[in-house]
Amino acid sequence: MNAHVKTQGNGAVDAPFYLPQGDEVAVFEAAAANDLPVLLKGPTGCGKTRFVAHMAARLGRPLYTVACHDDLSAADLIGRYLLKGGETVWTDGPLTRAVREGAICYLDEVVEARKDVTVVLHPLTDDRRILPIDRTGEEIEAAPGFMLVASYNPGYQNILKTLKPSTRQRFVAMEFDFPEPAREVEIVARESGLDRDRTLGLVRLAGKIRGLKGQDLEEGVSTRLVVYAASLTRRGMNLDRAIEAAMIEPLTDDAEVKRGLRDLAAAIFG
């Protein structure tokens, strides 16, 4: 099966740390209470996946996370017949398991999946809340608690990879972005354990780098990468080397652009 799936148990005690940026928690809770699907839009590494994990734990629901990719098909989500012990046995995919169990199914970067995936989602994202399985003849009604959540990065969309309006309009949608600096400092310090003074410098650098998006860089540095740089620094790595490894090399292969980013870091840290 080509789906890359992560599962998460329930229980608010295990909720991953997430610092709200606005009213996204309230919107998600209201959508969940009304059995509405949710679409999260925002750049890579801004906290969408962490938010979903936090909300699943907060609501006490199991979570199936599927990392979508070019080869992900509807069969990967629904299931297929597999050979086991000399016989052919039907095996549910992550979407089917979530529908049966009343769990949250999160499709990360849904636009990366094959087009047949969106067709499967349509009957789950209207008042029918059903999942037809042609291979078995079943038509599964979603168990109480089932919720479909999908995400994508609008900045990566092109004419071949986009969500049709007919699909987008089936979801409650929320836009995410990188946290404002004071909140990002709090997040990075909490996640990495680095002192706030050095964390503040890394966040300032991240803001400067994000200003280059669309010019020298396809994408700005993510909060995730800032956490990586802070974590490396806290473990004793030289700050310049940590920035190079976590905030420069992952963004570009262009030697000239990398030199410019190093100069930017030097201007901030001296």
From Swiss-Prot:
Record-listed ATP binding positions: 42-49, 102-109
Keyword hit for Transcription: no
GO function term, MF aspect, one: ATP binding
Segments traversing the membrane: none
Tree of life domain: Bacteria
Keywords: ATP-binding, Nucleotide-binding
Keyword set includes Nucleotide-binding: yes
InterPro entries linked: ATPase_dyneun-rel_AAA (IPR011704), CbbQ/NirQ/NorQ/GpvN (IPR050764), CbbQ_C (IPR013615), P-loop_NTPase (IPR027417)
Signal peptide (residue range): none
Family that this chain belongs to: Belongs to the CbbQ/NirQ/NorQ/GpvN family.
Name of this chain's protein: Protein NorQ
Organism, as annotated: Paracoccus denitrificans (strain Pd 1222)
